[in-house]
């Protein structure tokens, strides 16, 4: 069964305010975005999170820091990111957080006269080794808790090293997939075949409408066949974040979704 939730919204000043809106709209969870200052690991109080969770009858997922790079060539930076994720895993186990959403970064590139060359592309063996180390440490930490780290399509899996990295992560049962349908639509659904080939590992979805390359629209404001994605989410029991950027767009998306005034 699908569970619908909301993202961290910059207009809302506190988690309690977000939780109140989440309950008002009939949503089930809040995705805590760790790119926001209030959601840094050292600022997240497990007891307070639990209090809000119980008061409003919701749960949480986590969007890991969008700059997370466990493959950084700088060993200190790499270790810091890995330790951060391990800390989030421990928090997730305490609070029953089922999903940690993760981006895969392309890294830096060099612009040659005829093409871009990505550093990770030229050093794929190193990239994959660091990713393997990350996967194995996280898998051990997660154990049998049921927490999943879901890898999101963001800018596309068009670079071979990204696809190889995705499949390396999916070798572990601790990893699964997030399908961001709006971002995929903006690149002419280039990632859809990749997602569908691995659909058995689909657990999470970021849902927003799109009009051409304009994304994060309220549901119903774009041109996407949203019903087909809802069927896909239903088939795989996905948790679905209504990933708008404003409260107004979130309200509109909830109205569209439930067909009622909220």
Please give the residue ranges for each predicted region:
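Histidine-acidic metal/acid-base catalytic patches
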Residues: 1-3, 12, 16-23, 71, ...
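Soluble or luminal CAZymes and related metallo-dependent hydrolases
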Residues: 14, 41-44, 80-84, 123-134, ...
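Hydrophobic "anchor" residues on beta-strands that sit immediately upstream
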Residues: 27, 59, 148, 176, ...
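Short secondary-structure capping/turn micro-motifs that flank functional sites
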Residues: 38-39, 69-70, 108-109, 158-159, ...
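Alpha-helix-loop-beta-strand connector modules within alpha/beta enzyme cores
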Residues: 49-67, 129-142, 226-232
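Active-site acidic/histidine proton-transfer and metal-coordination neighborhood
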Residues: 55, 74-176
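A cross-domain feature marking catalytic cores of carbohydrate-active enzymes
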Residues: 6-10, 32-36, 60-66, 102-104, ...
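N-terminal pre-domain/capping segments
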Residues: 1-93, 258-262
